[in-house]
Amino acid sequence: MISFLRGTVAHVGLSSAVIDLNGAGMSVNATPQTLSGLRTGEEGKLFTSLIVREDSLTLFGFSSDDEREVFDVLLSVSGVGPRLALAVLAVHDPEAIRVAAHTGDGKAFTKVPGIGPKVAGRIVLELAGKLVPHGTGAAAAPAAAASAPWKPQVVAAMTSLGWSEKDATSSIDKALSDSPELEAGGQVAEILRATLRWLGQDGARAGNRVGSRG
């Protein structure tokens, strides 16, 4: 793995830079913020992540090791490739991403071009527990999120599947009234599955009630 590059900056473009390493030019993709810190002809250093594909090797560069760490974690989300992960870092700094993932703030991710509610919900769901804020940002989360940090994540996942926030919240509460042990465990995936099961059973009960009236 290429952990970082340090060399003379040969070129800075709109979405990438070229670092001269002893006569070899290494092309590195980066965010506008990272590129703005580089000056042609001067020494530059970028932390890097190498993406290996069957037909290509692509370097992505970052101004800090923290940015690279968040980038690599974002890549663990199904459907999120390196370009989209880089776009997230172009809109939010690493700490803001950590806070959004930790508090289940799916709306923060929809501010990124190319990310709609469905993908944002998936990001929040799959990053649960993987990104924890370093600073005080988590303290600014709503009190409800502090007492039940899993709840915004489950709500975001359900809204991405088509439910309104009000219906999602109500369904979660009703499902957990049948399975209180899940609330104590606070596992996002398990609570989401239990809520979806409850919705299916409630739909079946509603169908039975309609059938009995007919």
UniProtKB/Swiss-Prot annotation:
Main location: cytoplasm
GO CC annotation: cytoplasm; Holliday junction helicase complex; Holliday junction resolvase complex
Classification via CDD domains: UBA_RuvA_C
Segments of this protein annotated with the region Domain I: 1-63
Entry keywords, A to Z: Cytoplasm, DNA damage, DNA recombination, DNA repair, DNA-binding
Cited SUPFAM superfamilies: DNA helicase RuvA subunit, C-terminal domain (SSF46929), Nucleic acid-binding proteins (SSF50249), RuvA domain 2-like (SSF47781)
Region (Flexible linker): 143-153
GO biological process terms on file: DNA recombination; DNA repair
Span list, region Domain III: 153-214
Keyword DNA-binding: yes
Region entry Domain II, spans: 64-142
SMART domains tied to this protein: HhH1
Protein location: Cytoplasm
GO MF entries: ATP binding; four-way junction DNA binding; four-way junction helicase activity
Keyword DNA damage among UniProt keywords: yes
Coiled coil start-end: none
HAMAP family: DNA_HJ_migration_RuvA
Domain comment in the entry: Has three domains with a flexible linker between the domains II and III and assumes an 'L' shape. Domain III is highly mobile and contacts RuvB.
UniProt xrefs under NCBIfam families: ruvA (TIGR00084)
Role, per record: The RuvA-RuvB-RuvC complex processes Holliday junction (HJ) DNA during genetic recombination and DNA repair, while the RuvA-RuvB complex plays an important role in the rescue of blocked DNA replication forks via replication fork reversal (RFR). RuvA specifically binds to HJ cruciform DNA, conferring on it an open structure. The RuvB hexamer acts as an ATP-dependent pump, pulling dsDNA into and through the RuvAB complex. HJ branch migration allows RuvC to scan DNA until it finds its consensus sequence, where it cleaves and resolves the cruciform DNA.
Protein family: Belongs to the RuvA family.
Quaternary assembly: Homotetramer. Forms an RuvA(8)-RuvB(12)-Holliday junction (HJ) complex. HJ DNA is sandwiched between 2 RuvA tetramers; dsDNA enters through RuvA and exits via RuvB. An RuvB hexamer assembles on each DNA strand where it exits the tetramer. Each RuvB hexamer is contacted by two RuvA subunits (via domain III) on 2 adjacent RuvB subunits; this complex drives branch migration. In the full resolvosome a probable DNA-RuvA(4)-RuvB(12)-RuvC(2) complex forms which resolves the HJ.
Protein name according to UniProt: Holliday junction branch migration complex subunit RuvA
Organism: Arthrobacter sp. (strain FB24)
